[in-house]
Amino acid sequence: MKRLTLLLAMMTATAISINAEELESQESNQKTTIEVPAWVKNIKFSGYGMLQYQGTDQEGAKSNTFNLRLARFILDGKIGDFDWRAQIQGTNAKGPGEPTVQLVDLYAEWRKYPEFKIRAGQFKRAFTYENPTHPITQGWRGYADVINNLSGFGDRTGEKSSGGRDIGVQLSGDLFPNADGRRLFHYQVGIYNGEGINSKDKDNKKDIIGGIWVMPIKGLRIGAFGWTGTRGEMSSTYHYLEEYFDANNDKKTRLKNQSLTVQSARKNRYAFSAEYSKDEYMFRTEYLHSQGWGSNLNFGDKADGWYVFGIVPVIKSKLHAKARYQCYRQDKSWNRHELIDSDGKSYVYGGAKTSYEVGLNYFFTKNLEMHLEYARINDRSLAKHNYNMVDVELDFRF
């Protein structure tokens, strides 16, 4: 955690210094006032933390643990018509005792005109509604499984966890204002390396990702997204049955596996999305489809998934109730598959994972909230499909 502590100290020191509107120095009993430039005064320091308890009774993988889900520290600023952001993250994503610190956002965006904005650097990919949603605002124990696997988090291709981000350039804008000034159409399109955060392009080919949506009434948006590109080097595995003849000349099979690196692994994906968000009511659903091989070649070259959820106020600004249904099919099939050789050794793969979730979100203040959640999970890749999960989170912003 030394790296995280050092980075936090540096950012805190910067924030303290930039919030001073004047610097005064006394020399020879004379006081000199130095005006701080406007771009320096515009810099803001913020962040948030997510503390988690999670328990599950999954057979063979029971757990009951506290966890530091996420910590982020952010500098935002403005220089003329440009906004910029730098964000670092600390997380235990690798597991207890293995904290990681990494740069997740570093970009500048020209925002002079709402119809045409240009962003360059490292930032969220222009794919799906859920991807760019703040993890606390999102309101659940985690992003939907299909988002994690097909939107650049812990991607199907084996890409390192990138929080849905990549390095590139994006154009976006909002068009066609109505009589009230509310704009009815949004577009966004970006060109990216295709390798995730803090990584150069490994095959000199780029990912192109874009989306559009319409906003016919206040709070409602309906959209579609597309993604085509490659991952430069994809480490893959493949299990298969090899035939042979034994000493009695009887045909037998034995289970084998092979590791290989796929060059320029294709990613062709699309998504359909709908969302209504107004007066603390939030409803959202998305369907995602992927064509292209993943890091496990036994899964085939297709995957898909969807989710739908609702969050409604029980006590306005104080207590919300929520429910979510989600499904991810890692090989676009419902049931798992099994390879069994002549000696009875087997390899199981594929199948759908479905979750039914309910919970409550309680707001102590605007910047402090608790999330409670119960999930019933059906994972058909497991011998015992059904298990339960309980998740409690304390989330804060500053």
Residue ranges and their predicted role:
Residues 199-205, 265-267:
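Interfacial loop-to-helix transition and helix-capping segments at the boundaries
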Residues 23, 58-60, 107, 111, ...:
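Outer-membrane beta-barrel pore domains
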Residues 190-198, 234-236, 240:
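Active-site-proximal beta-alpha loop/turn segments in soluble metabolic enzymes
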Residues 14-15, 82, 336:
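Hydrophobic alpha-helical membrane context
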Residues 1-50:
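N-terminal periplasmic/intermembrane-space "pro-region" immediately following the signal or transit peptide
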Residues 32-194, 202-209, 213-222, 309-313, ...:
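Outer membrane beta-barrel
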Residues 51, 125, 198, 227, ...:
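Short, electropositive, low-hydrophobicity segments enriched in small/polar residues
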Residues 158, 199, 261:
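Charge-dense, low-complexity intrinsically disordered segments
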